[in-house]
Amino acid sequence: CVCVCETIYTRSRSTTTTTTESTMESKESSESSEEVTFKILVTHPEVPKEALDLMSRGCQLVMCDSLPPNRTEILQKAKGVHGMFWAVGLPLDKEVMDAAGSQLKSVSAMSAGIDHIDVAELKKRKIPLGHTPTVLNYAVADIAMGLMLSAARRFHEGRNKIDSSSWENYHIEWMWGQEIRDATVGFFGFGGIGQAIAQRLKGFDIEKILYTTRKRVDKSVEKEFNAAKVPFDDLLSQSDILFIAAPLTPETQGVFNSTSFAKMKKNAVLINIARGPIINQDDLYTALKTNQIFSAGIDVMSPEPLPADDKLLSLPNLVITPHIGSATQRTRTDMAVICAHNVLRGLVGEPMLSPAY
């Protein structure tokens, strides 16, 4: 993520920015100097200023003001826009596209995942879609490591012991956790985020990495991380620590369920930084409640927000964070700038920086 913004500007200023600026210059010299070429719907009022400044060069921004974001407002303000800066997890579907109108020609999500977007409908309308993968790999990998350590070494349970004055360290086996050293670490999905996690694991003296993906990663990647592709059942049965780092698809939805948990080690630590519905949460609750697996750490869940009375929150061996994997100033700003460039490039018919297809 070093100098991401500089890289973006190097690749994009000669196309999108120049195009929008030249459009402004030509219009300034005409009688209709106050007219703008494009309208862009910005679905969130807190988009970083860097992205807003970029898009406002020659474009009119139609800002949504509601917090949390409101679908009714989005539908009302979408009318007549040419581009959409989609910074919410609400569905971007046919209704939204119809509300915008036939002039809609560019959409980008300020997210890596696009499971909330009707991709087929966008393709049908020949509208390009951008998103913001890669740039968030580092921040998400960091929180994955935090969840791993917290779940393996029982941080949440330990804090509860302090709060309830239940220190029992006179027992030799009190609060024993799982070590990372010599662990077999599994990855369900081994793309950019998975490999960023693997990079961080190099300092933990793990034994090896196993991964399950649709396609084998490059041999050089396997060599770098001492990684081997295995069938899903082998991943479940052999992993001491298992990271879920795959996209949500019809094939991955609910794949971690009672059948899967029954095949895992009793000392297994499960981490999910991908999408909540990949795990059947009722089955996860049972697996943790009955100590079928040792512990879990999740940054994603279903639904989001998770209700305060959800039974998952009663589990001492589950660490939960509120979907904050990319929540650093640097990463969110970079995501916003990339998203802005995607929208602008799509408007002028140029390839997006991060196209979804």
Residue positions per predicted region:
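Compositionally biased low-complexity segments enriched in histidine and/or tyrosine
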Residues: 1-9
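An N-terminal-biased, well-structured beta-alpha scaffold segment characteristic
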Residues: 25-130, 257
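Rossmann-like dinucleotide/phosphate-binding beta-alpha-beta segment
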Residues: 33-36, 173-266
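A short, aliphatic-rich alpha-helical micro-motif
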Residues: 75-79, 97, 101, 180, ...
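Short glycine-/small-residue-rich Rossmann-like dinucleotide-binding loops
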Residues: 89, 112, 240, 246-248, ...
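A short helix->loop->beta-strand "cap" motif at the edges of active sites that frequently abuts
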Residues: 100-105, 125-127, 206-207, 266-268, ...
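Phosphate-binding beta-alpha-beta segment of Rossmann-like dinucleotide-binding domains, i.e.
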Residues: 127, 133-184, 196-199, 204, ...
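Rossmann-like dinucleotide-binding domain for NAD(H)/NADP(H)
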Residues: 129-130, 266-357
